[in-house]
């Protein structure tokens, strides 16, 4: 079966009025703030209005360790949400807003795909309601206020050598990673080395995703630490008197965006922290609203279960107080074959032809990664469901191999064809998810707030990643000691590492053993509410490839966007 392009499917979808989409969730028109015809903001008044409704079954979609191509988590999230409606359930989907950086880079857009996508996909991938721009503006206002403070006398005694706050932009631009500002003489500022990160890596984005209300966002923005004084005291956005103006910029951005799928299932799109260099989950407020509107809320966590799902459990759920009922692990034939170590998958290039040949033994050779990621879900007391995301090049024997591994591990499993068939292609998956979500589970956090920061890092490294231990660069060790002394030790930990391996080395596939996690730097995201450990060579500002997706994107003679994928 040949499936049209995602853009063609998106444009062929019969969109329903957003009032009808909202009505599926019991949201009245008074709670909607339309942005054009196909997107609306949802008022935060909905949180209070819906507080007496029962809580939805809460399902998180994660994956095995992916290839650079991605394994279809967003597509599976949307397909599952649609399939639950086929079973007569009221369902809602919650996903992150895509960053325009990867949209114009190698990865392309992030609306799902085929007959399981968020539509219109052009709106989702390009600007949407401007939340990304609000985050960028609020972040850079704080940068400007900080530099202005230095220029106007430095009343707070900020140490220019201990400034941790950079600037952000929603573009992949490697030339901005390291820059010098303030050149040109005294009238043009104070020269210092700094740089740009991508907006999705901004702490302001993480604050947006983890805030529970407008007032909570105001408090969190005020707590952002931008650097330290000469005596080692933290300097905050509140100290710089920037937090109020930042909140004013973000006042509309805190409201989730309502869209729909190709089958008119409601979707809440909100916030977009990256899954490898941030905590990688959509917003708490979107889940708080959708969780009171539906029988089932299906949300997505970035990259593999060791990344986005671990942070979903230990950062997002710790903050929101919501408790998941089931977790879906997306597995693909190609990813498991890649984990066999017999093939190399490169972003932007076709798969090796020999990788497409029927070979269930190669699938089984990479199955240790699936086994470990099932275990990572179980560590948190949640029932795992393996979703085999089917591709046209797969073979039945290869699906059977994945099913056999999942069943050996005691996990439910279903083969899903939601890309080519929409919700009806994910009915088996929806049925086993309902079974898993309706059985009792004992959700638990991986570590208590009271554990020290080293213990938290080492718990994640050894129990989730499979490391033998952790090594710390001297600067990282000093930072941990300083953060404990300042009073930041009770915060959870977000570990930034490659998403292409359970380890910090992207070349180590499967479920590697006999390795040590190297922590080279530790930062404090106090506004967001976590400590941020950086392992290996992580880039907080991506670059463009040799042939970025931007080269293919244009408008036609009718003003329609072409080339977006």
Swiss-Prot record:
UniProt xrefs under InterPro entries: Formate_THF_ligase, Formate_THF_ligase_CS, P-loop_NTPase
Pfam families reported in the protein's UniProt record: FTHFS
GO molecular function terms attached to this record: ATP binding; formate-tetrahydrofolate ligase activity
Positions that bind ATP: 67-74
Top-level taxon in the UniProt lineage: Bacteria
EC number: 6.3.4.3
Leader sequence segment: none
UniProt pathway annotation: One-carbon metabolism; tetrahydrofolate interconversion
Keywords per UniProt: ATP-binding, Ligase, Nucleotide-binding, One-carbon metabolism
Top enzyme category: ligase
Catalytic activity: (6S)-5,6,7,8-tetrahydrofolate + formate + ATP = (6R)-10-formyltetrahydrofolate + ADP + phosphate
GO biological-process terms attached to the record: tetrahydrofolate interconversion
Family: Belongs to the formate--tetrahydrofolate ligase family.
Name of the protein in question: Formate--tetrahydrofolate ligase
Gene coding for it: fhs
């Amino acid at each position: 079966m040949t499936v049209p392009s995602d853009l063609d499917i998106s444009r062929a979808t019969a969109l329903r009025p957003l009032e009808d989409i909202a009505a599926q969730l019991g949201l009245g028109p008074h709670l909607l703030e339309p942005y054009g015809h196909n997107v609306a903001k949802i008022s935060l008044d909905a949180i209070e209005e819906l507080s007496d409704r029962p809580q939805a079954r809460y399902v998180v979609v994660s994956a095995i360790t992916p290839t650079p191509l991605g394994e279809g988590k967003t597509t599976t999230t949307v397909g599952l949400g649609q399939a639950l409606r086929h079973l007569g359930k009221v369902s809602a989907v919650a996903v992150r807003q895509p960053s325009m950086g990867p949209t114009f880079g190698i990865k392309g857009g992030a609306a799902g795909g085929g007959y399981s996508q968020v539509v219109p996909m052009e709106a989702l991938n390009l600007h949407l309601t401007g939340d990304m721009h609000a985050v960028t503006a609020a972040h850079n206002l704080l940068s400007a206020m900080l530099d202005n403070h230095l220029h106007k006398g430095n009343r707070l005694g900020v140490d220019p050598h201990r400034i941790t706050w950079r600037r952000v932009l929603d573009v992949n631009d490697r030339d901005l990673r390291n820059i010098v500002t303030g050149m040109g003489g005294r009238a043009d500022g104070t020269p210092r080395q700094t740089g740009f990160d991508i907006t999705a890596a901004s702490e302001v984005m993480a604050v947006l995703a983890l805030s529970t209300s407008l007032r909570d966002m105001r408090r969190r923005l005020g707590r952002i630490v931008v650097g330290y004084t000469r005596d080692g005291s933290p300097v905050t956005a509140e100290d710089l008197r920037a937090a109020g103006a930042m909140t004013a910029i973000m006042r509309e951005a805190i409201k989730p965006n309502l869209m729909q799928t190709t089958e008119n299932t409601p979707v809440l799109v909100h916030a977009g922290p990256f899954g490898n260099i941030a905590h990688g989950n959509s917003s708490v407020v979107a889940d708080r609203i959708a969780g009171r509107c539906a029988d089932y809320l299906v949300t997505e966590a970035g990259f593999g279960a060791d990344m986005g799902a671990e942070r979903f459990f230990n950062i997002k759920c710790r903050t929101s107080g919501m408790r998941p009922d089931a977790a879906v692990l997306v597995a693909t034939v190609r990813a498991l074959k890649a984990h066999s170590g017999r093939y190399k998958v490169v972003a932007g290039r076709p798969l090796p032809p020999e990788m497409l040949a029927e070979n269930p033994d190669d699938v089984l050779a990479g199955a240790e990664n699936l086994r470990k990621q099932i275990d990572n879900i179980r560590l948190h007391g949640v029932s795992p469901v393996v979703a085999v995301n089917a591709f046209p090049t797969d073979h039945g024997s290869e699906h059977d191999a994945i099913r056999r591994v999942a069943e050996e591990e005691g996990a439910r499993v279903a083969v899903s064809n939601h890309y080519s068939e929409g919700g009806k292609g994910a009915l088996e998956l929806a049925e086993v998810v309902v079974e898993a979500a309706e059985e009792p589970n004992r959700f638990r956090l991986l570590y208590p707030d009271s554990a020290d920061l080293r213990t938290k890092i080492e718990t994640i490294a050894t129990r989730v990643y499979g490391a033998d231990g952790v090594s710390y660069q001297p600067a990282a060790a000093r930072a941990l000691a300083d953060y404990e002394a300042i009073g930041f030790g009770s915060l959870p930990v977000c570990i930034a590492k490659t998403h292409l391996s359970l380890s910090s080395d992207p070349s180590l596939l499967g479920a590697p053993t006999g390795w040590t996690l190297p922590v080279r730097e530790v930062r404090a995201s106090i506004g967001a509410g976590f400590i941020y450990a950086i392992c290996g060579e992580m880039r907080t500002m991506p670059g463009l490839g040799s042939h970025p997706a931007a080269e293919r994107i244009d408008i036609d003679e009718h003003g329609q966007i072409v080339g977006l994928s």
